[in-house]
Amino acid sequence: MNKYKGIIFDLDGTLLNTIEDISDSVNEVLRVFNCPEHNYDDYKLKLGSGFKSLLENSFPEGTDEETILKGLDLFVKIYDKKFKNKTKPYEGISELLYELNKLGIKIGVNSNKRNDYTNELIKKFFEDISFVDIFGEREG
C-alpha cells in the first residue's frame, strides 16, 4: 500500500517551464507602452500572484491603474497566441507523472493560470497521464 494517495501540483514553475512565453508576452506589452523590458530572471521574481499582479510589477513604479488594465487586456491577447510557443515540461516531469500513475497515486493540478490555458497545456504535454482533477483560475 502506498503511503500517499494523491499529489496536487502547481503548473507554472513546477510541471512546466512557462517563463519564456510569459516574459515574451509581457515584454511585447511593455514595448507598446514604451516602457523598459525585463529579462527572464527578473520575471521569475514577479510571477506567482496572477497576471494582473505580474503586469503591476512589470510596469514602471507609479503607473496608473488604467494603463495597467489596458496592458493586461493586451497581454491576454498576446499570450493567447504565445502561451505554447516555448513552454515545455521540466526535465524528468513526464517520467515522474507516469511513475505516479503506475503506482496508483492520484494526480491533480491546481494553478492560478486561467483554466482554459491550464487544461490546454496539460493536454498538450501530458496527454498520456491520468489526472483526477485539473483546476485553473475561473470566474467567481
Regions found by a protein language model. Give the residues of each.
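Nucleotide and nucleotide-moiety/phosphate-recognizing core
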Residues: 93, 100, 127
